[in-house]
């Protein structure tokens, strides 16, 4: 079943002048695919994209169960749409947000916009509850729209459009921007896991280094951070942490150093490691595949 979040937009390649677009003409439909679970790779060894070809796709995102991951209510997808003319000149940029609610995606409510968008000077002039192709571009041959999407937990930007990315945030991307050219076309947003998941199952003292950075709206770019040490007290029920290691990577649990190994292609992206602090491994830990 397609998970369609309806935001308005339009596109045409018709040379004949057209009237102002109707709502039906201007809709951009987003197929929000589930994200692949950790440890899933394609045949070439790269992190697997979500979706595949099955019409009945399993959910694979954020409730981090041993079996699968699910999108959770409260999750937010930030979407940027760039509209170009036939000369490939950027003419208009819009930002929108889709929120998971009751097992479905919806636009932000008026109250959520008042609480979280209105105070954000950097975002509010680009923000649209529903994204529609600009009337001045509708019906012009050669126009197109590029779409970007990013998941950053359930966070909203601060007044400067910044969202902090720390080890408790699972960042999820689409692999490339999506281009749409035709009215009524469904934009299929397929996601992948760019980070590594470390699942600690019980209380312990955990230490590791990670890149902490800031995601910037509306530009959809990252502000360089620092490779910082993290000294964390894992709660009794355990916790998941997300980071981007490079080469061989070492963590410390209750003072014992543990080496994490990459997959056969030397990559940590999309890999998952589960460690029980009461049964620490005697050697390096390989990813779960």
Could you describe each region identified by the protein language model?
Residues 11-289:
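Sec-type signal peptide cleavage vicinity
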């Amino acid at each position: 079943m397609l998970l369609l979040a309806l935001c308005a937009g339009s596109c045409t390649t018709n040379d004949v002048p057209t009237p102002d677009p109707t709502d039906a003409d201007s809709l951009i439909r987003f197929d929000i695919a589930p994200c692949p679970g950790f440890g899933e790779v394609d045949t070439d060894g790269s992190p697997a994209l979500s979706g595949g070809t099955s019409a009945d796709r399993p959910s694979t995102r954020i409730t981090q169960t041993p079996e699968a991951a699910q999108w959770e209510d409260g999750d937010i997808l930030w979407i940027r749409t760039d509209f170009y003319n036939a000369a490939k000149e950027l003419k208009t940029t819009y930002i929108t947000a889709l929120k998971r609610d009751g097992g479905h995606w919806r636009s932000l409510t008026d109250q959520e916009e008042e609480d979280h968008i209105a105070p954000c000077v950097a975002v509010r002039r680009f923000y649209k509850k529903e994204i529609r192709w600009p009337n001045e571009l509708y019906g012009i041959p050669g126009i197109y729209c590029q779409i970007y999407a990013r998941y950053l937990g359930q966070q909203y930007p601060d007044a400067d459009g910044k969202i902090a990315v720390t080890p408790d945030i699972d960042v999820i991307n689409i692999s490339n921007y999506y281009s749409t050219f035709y009215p009524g076309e469904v934009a299929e947003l397929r996601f992948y896991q760019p980070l590594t998941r470390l699942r600690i199952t019980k209380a312990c003292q955990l230490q590791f280094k990670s890149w902490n950075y800031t995601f910037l709206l509306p530009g959809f770019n990252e502000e360089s951070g620092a490779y910082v040490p993290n000294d964390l007290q894992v709660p009794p029920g355990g916790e998941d942490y997300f980071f981007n290691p490079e080469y061989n990577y070492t963590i410390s649990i209750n003072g014992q150093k543990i080496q994490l190994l990459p997959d056969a292609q030397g990559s940590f992206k999309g890999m998952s490691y589960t460690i029980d602090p009461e049964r620490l491994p005697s050697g390096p830990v390989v990813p779960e595949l």
